[in-house]
Curated annotation (Swiss-Prot):
Organism: Borrelia recurrentis (strain A1)
Positions of transmembrane segments: none
CDD domains, sorted: SHMT (cd00378)
Name this protein carries in UniProt: Serine hydroxymethyltransferase
Record-marked site positions (Plays an important role in substrate specificity): H220
Keywords tagged on the record: Amino-acid biosynthesis, Cytoplasm, One-carbon metabolism, Pyridoxal phosphate, Transferase
Job of this protein: Catalyzes the reversible interconversion of serine and glycine with tetrahydrofolate (THF) serving as the one-carbon carrier. This reaction serves as the major source of one-carbon groups required for the biosynthesis of purines, thymidylate, methionine, and other important biomolecules. Also exhibits THF-independent aldolase activity toward beta-hydroxyamino acids, producing glycine and aldehydes, via a retro-aldol mechanism.
Name of encoding gene: glyA
Family membership noted in the UniProt record: Belongs to the SHMT family.
Matches recorded under InterPro entries: PyrdxlP-dep_Trfase (IPR015424), PyrdxlP-dep_Trfase_major (IPR015421), PyrdxlP-dep_Trfase_small (IPR015422), Ser_HO-MeTrfase (IPR001085), Ser_HO-MeTrfase-like (IPR049943), Ser_HO-MeTrfase_PLP_BS (IPR019798), SHMT-like_dom (IPR039429)
């Protein structure tokens, strides 16, 4: 690379990733094959439209690539329809929502501070700006979704669309119960599995594909693919809906809402990376990987509990969990900074019914996908949890420096994918 300044920055990031324990639940490490696809000549090709229906010439090869990604996504999730063009999970949600309902309609999604996502109705997101947004949360006692409460809220506000999914909820979601509620109030159901897609694809969590009208996801996180979005449909794919004042099947409405509705040309190099990731996820080794992710996550959560810390909802069913730091007398923001100083990366996170501002927060979110991609096992994960507790409890800067060197020595023994 001729640009030495940029090259040095990339090398610094590579070094940071090698020498850090990565616990951000939404991050992962892609394979070298995915990186090769994303860094390929496909970045040169503009391909507005869809396979065999492009607005540019010279698209025969990228048509085959997109069709390959679509077929692999459908096989992986048991779907009848897939759109692999969304640039992100948020854009996948935007297209899915706008294909099902119109601006001003009512949305019912999970409260952001209880584990939801910005695109599920937050006032700072398009979903809260252009739609009449309502929210459900978790029970104060169990810190889990109370489906009877969701039903009562739905009956009270009569939403046009219910969104099931989360970004910091550690329990498996019952999508069938959400569909029952949606049917009772004549609402569409959108399931967002951005965080748990890998668990759904491998059968560790129940699948919403034939339950929801539409399912959205990211292609990174637990799928270990490139950063991007995905929209899927099962048996509802050919349901007739009113889109833009025209009767259309749901799959065609979604296609129109992705392009030209919310995006221009697709990123063909990223779609190629998605195709690689879908193939990798279809292998038995990937199911074994997800099993280890769940095992490592549970091991860390159980260790924190054994050390007297409180885990939101008392445990985890997936790849992440939230730690309430109130007992240690520090905030999530404090913990994030302390841990970054010892080469452990995670994020501050609000806990349900948090009294602190989200920019400060009472908790931290911990996820195991990235460390599992580096080969850490259950015992290694417990050691990671031990590093965290040592760092958060010490008042000594010398001890923090010592922990940092231990962390670097420990994690550097595990290869990057």
């Amino acid at each position: 690379m001729i640009d030495n300044i940029l090259f040095d920055l990339i090398e610094r990031e590579a070094k940071r990733e090698r020498e850090n324990i990565e616990l951000i639940a939404s991050e992962n490490f892609v394979s070298s094959d995915v990186r090769q696809a994303v860094g390929s000549v496909l970045t040169n090709k503009y391909a507005e439209g869809y396979p065999s229906k492009r607005y540019y010439g010279g698209c025969s090869v990228v048509d085959d690539i997109e069709n390959l990604a679509i077929s692999r996504a459908m096989e992986l999730f048991g779907a009848s329809y897939a759109n692999v063009q969304p640039h992100s999970g948020s854009q996948a949600n935007m297209a899915a929502i706008m294909s099902l309902i119109k601006p001003g309609d009512k949305i019912l999604g999970m409260e952001l501070s209880h584990g939801g996502h910005l695109t599920h109705g937050s006032k700072v997101s398009f979903s809260g700006m252009f739609f009449d947004a309502y929210s459900y949360g978790v029970s104060r006692d169990s810190e889990m979704i109370d489906y009877d409460d969701v039903r009562n809220i739905a009956k009270a506000c009569r939403p046009n669309l219910i969104i099931a999914g989360a970004s910091s909820y550690s329990r498996e979601i019952d999508f069938k119960k959400f569909r029952e509620i949606a049917n009772e109030v004549s609402a569409y159901l959108l399931c967002d599995i951005a965080h748990t897609a890998g668990l759904v694809a491998t059968g560790f969590h129940n699948s919403p594909i034939d339950v929801a009208h539409l399912t959205t996801s990211t292609t990174h996180k637990t799928l270990r693919g490139p950063r991007g979005g995905l929209i899927l449909a099962g048996k509802e794919f050919n349901t007739m809906i009113n889109y833009n004042n025209k009767e259309r099947t749901l799959d065609l409405a979604v296609n129109s809402c992705v392009f030209p509705g919310t995006q221009g040309g697709p990123l063909m190099h990223v779609i190629a990376g998605k195709a690689v990731a879908f193939k990798e996820a279809l292998n038995k080794e990937f199911k074994d990987y997800i099993s280890r992710v769940i095992e490592n996550t549970k091991a860390m959560a159980e260790y924190f509990i054994s050390e007297g810390l409180r885990i939101v909802s008392g445990g985890t069913d997936n790849h992440l969990f939230l730690v309430d730091l109130s007992g240690l007398g520090i905030t999530g923001a404090d913990a994030e900074k302390i841990l970054e100083s010892v080469n452990i990366t995670l994020n501050k996170n609000a806990i349900p019914f948090d009294s602190k501002n989200p920019s400060v927060a009472s908790g931290i979110r911990i996820g195991a996908p990235a460390i599992t991609s580096r080969g850490l096992n259950r015992d290694d994960s417990i050691k990671v949890a031990h590093f965290i507790i040592r760092a958060l409890k010490t008042k000594s800067t010398d001890e923090l420096r010592k922990i940092k060197q231990e962390v670097i020595g420990f994690i550097s023994s595990f290869d990057m994918p």
